[in-house]
Amino acid sequence: MFNIPPVVIATVAVLVLVHALRMLVLSDAEDLRFLLTFAFIPARYDTDLVLGGSFPGGLGADLWTFFTYAFLHADLLHIGLNLAWLLPFGTALARRFGAWRYVAFMLVVAAAGAFAHLVSHPGAMVPMIGASAAISGAMAAALRFVFQRGGPLGFWRLDSPGDSYRVPAAPLLATLRDPRFLIFLGVWMGLNALFGLGSTSMVGDGQEIAWQAHIGGFVAGLLLFTAFDPVVPRRELDTRPNG
């Protein structure tokens, strides 16, 4: 049975409630102010722009929008696609990390996605929203262990579902050389390029996909996985004395 951890259910609930608030409760003017307060807007950080100081939220928003943009979505399709990616990869990560590490990790990779967008779109006025930079980070982290022997997608999966999510992870270089990782990455990138699945949107005409944020979240997930992972790496297990 596909048992979703409570922290992932809570994540889904928060995303849905925020979207419902914007769509059903706030007026158009209120929603615009809400968007300008909590979406990620690179122009906030451009001191050469006259409008840079006119965004609502002030200095606080300069910090919190690195995280809060991930809770906003453009429409039902946008949030639905992101939830479809979040459920499997968020579940894998939460089962391995536990609730608090999962939350901290998701916030960090969301911020990494925002930073990548800031670097690639300096001074841009178009707000960026969507959870997929964080989900990209969760996907990258999950790919460090799901294909390992005894893991949920590996050979000889362990009988206990909980244990299968806590097998020792592959080293980073081994992950990057794993054909299964490369195939999965290629399919995911292709789907995003063709259909914008799980996209982080730059709000505006056409809702351009902020693919740099996806890459930022993904790379951060790969690199920071070890810092959050509570499972002892295999190489450390192999060097421990017996008895």
How should these model regions be labeled?
Residues 1-243:
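A detector for small-residue-rich transmembrane helices and their helix-helix packing motifs
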